[in-house]
Design a protein with these regions (language model features):
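Short active-site neighborhood of thiol/selenol oxidoreductases, capturing the structured segment around
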Residues: 4-27, 47
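Loop/turn elements at helix/coil->beta-strand transitions in domains of secreted/extracellular proteins
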Residues: 11-14, 43-46, 73-75, 102
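Short loop/turn elements that flank and shape the SAM/SAH-binding pocket of Class I
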Residues: 1-4, 83-85
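Structural micro-motif
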Residues: 72-76, 90-98
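Structural microenvironment flanking redox-active thiols in thiol-disulfide oxidoreductases
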Residues: 27-71, 81-88
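Thiol-/selenol-based redox modules, centered on thioredoxin-like
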Residues: 99-136
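Active-site-proximal beta-strand/loop segments in catalytic clefts of secreted hydrolases
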Residues: 18-20, 50-53, 80-82, 110-113
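Surface-exposed alpha-helical interface segments used for non-catalytic interactions
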Residues: 31-34, 62, 95, 123, ...
Length: 136
């Protein structure tokens, strides 16, 4: 698959999530990202993972591909070896998910585990996505 750009995804709601496969907190969100992909892929929502490595193993595209397959993550994933995307988004922590509307504007984000200690980040993002899908 060729690299994706937000420009190519105009007209769709895009969920961009930054993570590292060896990040414990990131693991807690994988099931939610997988659910979102399955739930919304036919409705104009694209989930994109950006693996920003902390360790040498996380820099290896084959290891990233294997880890994604093991976790049944079937959405597009890129390896941000030089942290260029991390820096461009001014991201500060793993995991973080950004919600981009159909026009390419950042509308919502969540940093950390979506459901850490009773938080309802997944529900907040889901409500935001539903609202964006309802917009013309």
């Amino acid at each position: 698959m060729l690299p994706l750009t937000l420009k190519e995804l105009r007209g769709k709601v895009v969920l961009v999530h930054f993570y590292a496969f060896q990040c414990h907190n990131c693991h807690a969100n994988f099931e939610i990202y997988r659910r979102w992909h399955e739930q919304w892929r036919e409705k104009g929502v694209v989930v994109v993972g950006i693996q920003t490595p902390e360790t040498s193993q996380e820099r290896d595209p084959a290891a990233v591909k294997s880890a994604a397959a093991e976790r049944k993550l079937e959405f597009p994933i890129m390896v941000d070896v030089a942290s260029k995307n991390w820096d461009a988004w001014e991201n500060t922590m793993w995991p973080t998910v950004y919600v981009v509307d159909k026009n390419g504007y950042l509308r919502q984000w969540w940093q950390g585990e979506l459901n850490w200690k009773g938080a309802t980040g997944d529900k907040s993002i889901e409500q935001g996505v539903a609202q964006l899908l309802a917009e013309p």
